[in-house]
Amino acid sequence: MAKVIGIDLGTTNSCVAIMDGAQPRVIENSEGARTTPSIVGFTDSERLVGQPAKRQAVTNPSNTVFAVKRLIGRRVGDAEVEKDKKLVPYAIVNGGNGDAWVEVRGEKYSPSQISAFILQKMKETAEAYLGESVTQAVITVPAYFNDAQRQATKDAGKIAGLEVLRIINEPTAAALAYGLDKKDTKTIAVYDLGGGTFDITILEIDDGLFEVKSTNGDTFLGGEDFDMRIVNYLADEFKKEHGVDLTLDKMALQRLKEAAEKAKIELSSSQQTEINQPFISMDRNTGQPLHMVMKLTRAKLESLVADLIKKSLKPCEAALKDAGVSKSDIDEVVLVGGMTRMPRVVEEVTKFFGKEPHKGVNPDEVVALGAAIQAGVLQGDVKDVVLLDVTPLSLGIETLGGVFTRLIDRNTTIPTKKSQVFSTAEDNQNAVTIRVFQGEREMAADNKMLGQFNLEDIPPAPRGMPQIEVTFDIDANGIVSVSAKDKGTGKSQNITIQASGGLSDEDIEKMVRDAEANAEADKKRRELVETKNQGESLLHSTRKSIEEHGDKVDPSTVEAIELAMGALEESLKTEDAGKIKGGIQNLTEAAMRLGEAIYKASQSETGAAPDEDGPRSVDDDIVDADFEDLGENKRK
């Protein structure tokens, strides 16, 4: 039975894990790392994912996409998207349906597509380790993701060639990994501050039962925001000193971002770090190069990001209130996400909950481990684990006057189904439009619109007379279906909510085909590189053989080999793998003649060496005598 893998699709880094016996295990990628940067780079000839993409980001900033998770399921015009446009070096554009897409090298990609490239890398990592094909996965999302973001994540899995068996909330996955072997009853808080999102989840764990009591968060608060505070500080200081605005230079901005991330990490274990960026710009008056050499202290960093840390505590208050528990009722605080390595974050969380956080989990890996456990549960490999999750936001419809009427309140355990009867607003109204929203505001327009559909052919009747039953159904992935039924006629209409933009089935199928075509192109590219390496290696070894033994063979043989070498060198300048293979074959055959000639020359020298005392037969040579002596010695 094929393995189901667990994937933590992160803003900054991603991670893949499987169940190895009774325990989850993180799989190392092809570079030997346990996490993979969630970065995709596009060069002239290929697409790079992970560390190779990160390495070339400074020299190729406009074509290197990072933190795309912050765009997934979002619309152009959203405040978060407009903010991101000013911060990232790549282009964020309208996908044609109002969704935020990215544009690289003149081609548009949806955030789901970019995420799919990262998921493909995770899939390949697992396949290389397992030695078999992987087709099914459990993928994690921030607990506070809305329906559009969850659907877009599921689409990303499909584009990557994965059947997504379950979308699971990141804090819930972390709780699974934390509590898998724990038998006692505990109420825990999972504080998850990652690269781009923040979640807080309150759970009750009782011998294999994981019940989420409440969840809250901010899908636009994370390490990327901390990095940008440092970037802006460095750019401001540099501008004060040199009068040059580095934020206008995409390459300099990318260098600053990398330096900021490095400085932030270093300041988690030291009090001060030096940011050294030589030749980062040029003096406009003198033409002399400008260098950035600046010291950053932990205290200064903490002052730059103090409000961001405080911002994470408001959802904590809301989650405790929704769960109906006090801070003193929390038995354990589990920290998740790379940002929880920052000492000031730990201090603030400790102060808020009044207890030291649990330090027994790896914040970068625990979510993927939890996803693998959930995969094991779905596959039947993990027994006695029951997971009860919740919907993070209230769901409802727009009613008369633009009011948001809730059908399902936030923090309702899922899967769930709820119905409510509505009526018409006007006499003889023959159709109603059901507009579905998700959020906590009282007016529908202030919430996130998930979609709309019409129920038509309602028999003429006075207003308030027809009975229209609206039913909301949320599955275990947190994805919503809505139906409306005229109880008088029995006529019904239903939809699985797709964001008002979103990807259609046709879009997804096209992207799946593109991904498959790209996989084939990537395979050919890898084959070409390997063939070129083989050709270079053969040229080197043949050249060395000619230098050492060329005088032992006739000139015509050497000439034939040199001709074959020249032809191979020319073919290596092309991108034609078939031509290169032909060149390798020809040179291999020519080089074999060199080997034969060297061998014959060697035999001739050994067998026909003259003796000063007269001719001597081969039988008189000492080889036989030596052999006999060795035999005697062995018998002794």
UniProtKB/Swiss-Prot annotation:
Record GO terms (molecular function): ATP binding; ATP-dependent protein folding chaperone; unfolded protein binding
Highest taxon listed in the record's lineage: Bacteria
Keyword DNA repair included in the entry's annotation: no
Induction of its expression: By stress conditions e.g. heat shock.
Pfam families, sorted: HSP70 (PF00012)
UniProtKB keywords: ATP-binding, Chaperone, Nucleotide-binding, Phosphoprotein, Stress response
Descriptive protein name: Chaperone protein DnaK
Species of origin: Cereibacter sphaeroides (strain ATCC 17025 / ATH 2.4.3) (Rhodobacter sphaeroides)
Gene (UniProt): dnaK
